A protein has these predicted regions:
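DNA replication initiation on ssDNA origins
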Residues: 1-60
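A short acidic, often aromatic-flanked loop/helix-cap motif at beta-alpha or helix-coil junctions
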Residues: 12-15, 22-25, 81, 121-123, ...
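Signature for HUH/AEP ssDNA processing cores
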Residues: 46-128
Length: 195
């Protein structure tokens, strides 16, 4: 006998429903201990894992972010380009730490974010090229301030209203903070783009 199982996932204002056909034999089957993994996943399984990871990111984004939150793209100039992925992760972690500290100073709620680091290896596989970051974070801070913090320089917040001071801050590269734009699927398009 075949029956249908329905799995509902609620993400803030969005709901996903999975319809899963099941048989009684499949429901009652018990599995023993798993054996040691002997071979790599089949391409079919890798595709399913990739699809589920993208779906989870969409659910995470729709459940935690809404209108008024920010999508920030951060790149590096040639002189600031990190040599390794670990070095880039350290730089972006410091950036997020500065944002969290500023939010705390202003009495805003704690920082929530999704970070995706994109990079490709050169043809010889020895080095990375054009590493950059996509960050979805909760709003509250001014977009100009979020962009200004993409620097190694220490920021004197008492002088930030002076345009000359703002211009003197040397950024790590190009940075752009945009407000999230929702549609009927929330931020699904953005989440699929950054994966």
């Amino acid at each position: 006998m075949v029956f249908i199982r329905e799995k509902k996932t609620d993400c803030a204002n969005y709901r996903e429903v999975d319809i899963i056909p099941r048989t009684e034999a499949a429901e009652q089957a018990t599995r023993g201990k798993r054996g040691r993994k002997r071979k790599s996943n089949a391409p079919k399984q890798k595709d399913l894992n990739d699809k589920n990871a993208k779906r989870y990111l969409v659910q995470l984004g729709n459940g935690n972010f809404s209108i008024g939150d920010l999508h920030t793209s951060c790149t590096y100039s040639e002189e600031n380009l990190p040599g390794t992925v670990e070095e880039a992760e350290k730089i972006v972690t410091n950036y997020l730490r500065r944002i969290a500290y500023r939010r705390n100073k202003l009495g805003l709620e704690p920082l929530k974010y999704i970070l995706v680091t994109e990079y490709k290896y050169t043809k010889d596989g020895q080095s990375i090229k054009r590493i950059h970051h996509h960050i979805i974070m909760n709003g509250g801070l001014d977009r100009d301030d979020v962009e200004m913090m993409w620097t190694k320089d220490r920021i004197n917040w008492k002088k930030t209203s002076d345009p000359e001071y703002r211009a003197s801050i040397k950024q790590l590269g190009w940075v752009n903070a945009d407000r999230l734009q929702m549609n009927e699927n929330g931020i699904e398009g953005l989440c699929k783009y950054i994966v």
